[in-house]
Regions:
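Entry beta-strands of beta-propeller and related beta-repeat scaffolds
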Residues: 43-46, 102-105
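Short glycine/acidic-enriched loop and turn motifs that connect beta-strands
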Residues: 52-55, 110-111
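Conserved small/polar residues in nucleotide/adenosyl-binding loops
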Residues: 112-117
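Surface loop/turn signatures of beta-propeller and other carbohydrate-active proteins
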Residues: 1-35, 54-57, 71-98
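Beta-propeller blade signature
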Residues: 64-67
Length: 122
């Protein structure tokens, strides 16, 4: 799922001439809530909900951009894509923290079930 999103962006990215100068924008698709705004290894990281395949809402992925000056942002590969049964609707709001020297992402997922005994709800 991650590679599919990254490949789509490589083929359908928005040209830099069409983007604002000082605002974070996705390389392709639709952008929503900022998440995981953090400093890691001396750089500022911004993760955000987005759907890379259309300019409308879809199963949320997490985009990722990095800056050193809060003006020039570098797009990184898609950080998260909904690729599990429990997050197939999307990877929603969350945070980024440093733990044991690693950048750890925490997010919200949503699972609907009619089976109250479903193990994935425990």
């Amino acid at each position: 799922m991650l590679e599919k999103a990254n490949e789509y962006i490589r083929q359908n990215y928005i040209d830099e001439k069409e983007k604002p100068l000082f605002h974070v924008t996705p390389e392709a698709g639709w952008m929503n809530d900022p998440n995981g705004f953090s400093v890691y290894q001396g750089k500022v990281h911004l993760f955000y909900q987005f759907y890379p395949y259309k300019t409308e809402w879809g199963p949320m992925h997490w985009g990722h951009q990095v800056t050193e000056d809060l003006l020039k942002w570098e797009a990184y590969p898609v950080a998260m894509a909904p690729d599990q049964d429990y997050d197939h609707i999307g990877c929603f709001s969350g945070s980024a923290v440093e733990a044991d020297g690693k950048h750890v992402l925490l997010y919200t997922c949503l699972l609907y079930t009619s089976d109250a005994a479903d193990d994935s709800l425990r």
